Amino acid sequence: MRTGKSHLSADGLEYVTQCNHLAPFLLTNLLLPRLAAAGTARVVNVSSIAAIRNGLIGWAPLDMDNINYAKDHSPQALMYAYHNSKLMNILFTY
């Protein structure tokens, strides 16, 4: 998890979200036909307890209107992006 200033990719997405969730999501979906053809393949997604910050157990909900925290310039913005990415891992798994 990084701290400091948020950085957006050329796609306009926060790097934390892109690396922690979108890249594994894309890779899994690209490999899914081959995994299904293999018959015994499994996909294992790894998340973090940090996901609870986002409402599964209590704290703030996932803010889809501010997914990159572009409106939030606080030092905590990257931490929130990390929490969101870990919640996205869980939601993708189920």
Q: How would you name each of these model-derived features?
A:
Residues 1-94:
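Rossmann-fold NAD(P)H-dependent dehydrogenase/reductase core
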